[in-house]
Amino acid sequence: MAFRIEDIELGDDTSLLAELVACWRASVEATHTFLTPDDIERIAGYVPDAIASVAHLAVCRDEGGKVAGFIGVDDAMVEMLFIHPSLRGCGLGSLLLDHAVSEHGATLVDVNEQNGQAVGFYEHYGFEVFDRSETDGMGDPFPILHMRLRPTSHGSA
């Protein structure tokens, strides 16, 4: 299956925003096993605004145009990277991250410590932990690993 990545301006495209939120939810439900259903519902209330406000948003679509995943970058920070769970392991995360690094200078990411698969993905790509926070950005008790791309690693210039 072929995929394409495109930078997008979300604007007032509510149907695309709904697709991205659905991708976020499916991904989080499959990977963030440390969150309760109530946690997911609470966080879901913030997701549309977070997606709409990110400086650079890139979407990965399948041959039929359906959203397969997306990445958001603000300054050098990867703010979000979500892949539809049915397509995990196909290399889409690396494709989106390659795009974010080469096109938007992404070198930083914050990862939930309890999401071991994501931590492993970023480490394999070439990120390393440089700091840790006991709580997430909303003050909830979900520890965050602050990671940066090693200068000589995959994807870096």
Please give the residue ranges for each predicted region.
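Conserved N-terminal entry element of GNAT/NAT acetyltransferase domains
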Residues: M1-S15, S153-A157
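Conserved GNAT-fold acetyl-CoA-binding loop/helix
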Residues: A22-P48
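Conserved beta-hairpin
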Residues: A55-G69
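Conserved catalytic-core motifs of GNAT/GCN5-like acyltransferases
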Residues: D110-N112, E128-H146
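Conserved GNAT acetyl-CoA-binding A-motif
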Residues: S102-Q114
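Conserved acetyl-CoA-binding loop-helix of GNAT-fold acetyltransferases
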Residues: G89-S102, G120, H124
